[in-house]
Amino acid sequence: MAHQGDPNISLPFPASPVANNNGAAIASRSPLVDPTIYPGNSRSISSIALHALGLGITLSACTIATIQLALSGYRIWRLTEFIATLSLFHFLEFWTTARYNTANAKVSSYLLTSNGSAYLIAHLAAMIEIIVTSFYFPGLQDRYSNAYTIAFGLALVVMGQAIRSIAMAQAGVSFNHIPAKSKKNDHVLVTEGLYSHFRHPSYFGYFFFAVGTQVVVANKICCVSYLIILWFFFKDRINHEEQDLVKFFGDDYRSYRQRVGTGIPFIP
């Protein structure tokens, strides 16, 4: 049986000889550690842990607050419900990436700050509309919100989140939060599962998830705004992304594009 000092053993880390108490040479193991997992880097374990803790606390606190506020008849339950939904979404973005696309999991995979200022402004606008209508224009909420609209909105949120997360899982290493500009060796054209029904199921899922969040909280202005802005955003993004996908996969992608639609209304 080979032992630690066997020169024929290929170790996953460098071994340097040091002396034991008897003066004999033994192998000292110094693990090769990815420097990006240290604090301040893109895969910082400490930062990942803090993000998960923060999202978990926020999700738990806001879920409890939503239930208590709703049962007590306070309209502001919509604000805590919206924040709870966002907390779960951002956690699942990282978790799904870490589980099915491990090599590409980074702190930025939470998408908390990497989606740009427009993304943050959209959420801030939704929160402001909730606060303003809850305290100053409650009649608007009563006009557009009831048990049926809330249930419909929640159905859109759950469906959208499920489709997006499953799409990320099925794409595996071929999924990127930022569209790839060059083809990697492990990048393959995924056409099975959800991808046999939608060309971009993660976009389809997020489109209806985002609109659903506004239906739940009865945000009339943001609901219409989200619908319009996201439609133009995904139309433009899909157009540019597919130009690169045609370069990567040629006729295979052209054929796939002819067979399968996006599922997003009026985006073929």
Q: Where are these predicted regions, by residue range?
A:
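Active-site-proximal inter-transmembrane loops
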Residues: 178-206
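Membrane-anchoring alpha-helices and their flanking helix-loop junctions
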Residues: 2-185, 210-268
